[in-house]
Amino acid sequence: MSRVDPDFPQKVYDVVSKIPRGKVMTYGQIAAYCGAAWASWEVGQIAHNGPSDLPWQRVVNKRGGLAAGWPGGGRATHAELLRAEVVEVSDEYTVDVNKLLWNPSQATLL
């Protein structure tokens, strides 16, 4: 993760902690809000290894796809966590990003 600044993981944690129930953000969108639009892969790595008390279930890929590598059960577990927040998840393990995407202002994230 040497391509990003040392504060990048903390910035990701801060953004993810603010995603409201029933909304999602994409890996690339989070990377852009954190000042490194090209770093979506790094956001995924941070999500996979980050603090478990953050709402990582609200992070999806740009097509609304759920994480195959979700700890403890892959996409099915990811879907279960989102459904518990009354988020509709398709049988293909995707969500409607057009409907659910959270686009906060930078001021909201500060």
Q: How would you describe each model-predicted region?
A:
Residues 1-110:
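Nucleic acid-binding interface residues in structured DNA/RNA-binding domains
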